[in-house]
Amino acid sequence: MPNLFVIAGPNGAGKTTYVRDFLPQEMRCREFVNADLIAAGLSPFAAEKASFEAGRIMLRRLRDLAARREDFSFETTLSGRAYAPLFRELRAAGYFIQLDFLWIPHLDITRNRVRQRVTKGGHNIPDDVQLRRFHLGVRNLAELYRPLLDHWRLFDNTGDHPHLVAQEKSGTIEIVDVPHLAIIEQSASVRFVSDSPAITAEEAPAFTPDEVTRRSLRAMRRAYARVVLENKAWGLPVIQWRDGIGVVEVPPEQLEPFARRILEVDGDPLPADEERALLSHLKI
């Protein structure tokens, strides 16, 4: 069965960074299509003006890959509804569709991350576009795309350790982090479990991640640590969210120990050879 991996989330959520670790290393998928990168190629100094043409090129490329029944992936904010017909076509053709949504709790995080990306030579997304897209993605996941997916997962990608909030596979939903899901539902004015009472934290079952989820979280940690170390090399802070505080900046001089904390798994450090390779990979 061929696979489609969709990586979704607001601008600045870390989608492309996650993809670079997750797809080739953990899922052995080499085909990745990104409309923002296409737009940047069409118009390097004003990529937003090429977004419509980039979207057309992207959809054409996706259908070409599907016609060859290849495994492939693409990135999206999921703020539009145009992918629904494509998902229906692919499921009818026998594709297994998995979507990972990387959630960000506050628009200020995305704005600051996009500004940093521009500083490092990446593409810009205008503030008004970020604002329009911010809540639409998770709302469309809950209200439009859920029944078109075989497996979706909702991750919080802002704290020291990215973690799974909820997932649904083959129609069975599993809520892993009840308080975070409640925050997401309230902020986006949406319900993922609309036909049953809200689950309390005490009622949530114990969660044991499967192998694919462990791979995803491992890739997210590696990807986040890379960004942290890249920011250190550029002399930039890391923008993140801390419960009870809000948006905070971790200054450059604190970023190497911060990267080490990210790589720890339940208090266990990354194997020494992997840590050395990661901590020494940036030469700017």
Regions found by a protein language model. Name each.
Residues 17-70:
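Conserved substrate/cofactor phosphate-moiety recognition/catalytic segment
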Residues 195-284:
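N-terminus-biased detector of the onset of the functional/mature region
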Residues 10:
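P-loop (Walker A) phosphate-binding loop of NTP-binding proteins
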Residues 143-195:
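NTP-dependent small-molecule kinase module
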Residues 5-6:
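Short hydrophobic/aromatic beta-strand immediately N-terminal to the Walker A/P-loop
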Residues 14:
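Conserved glycine(s) of the Walker
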Residues 50-104, 134-137, 153:
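Glycine-rich phosphate-binding loop used to anchor ATP phosphates in small-molecule kinases
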Residues 95-144, 195:
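A glycine- and Lys/Arg-enriched "phosphate-lid" helix/loop adjacent to the NTP-binding pocket
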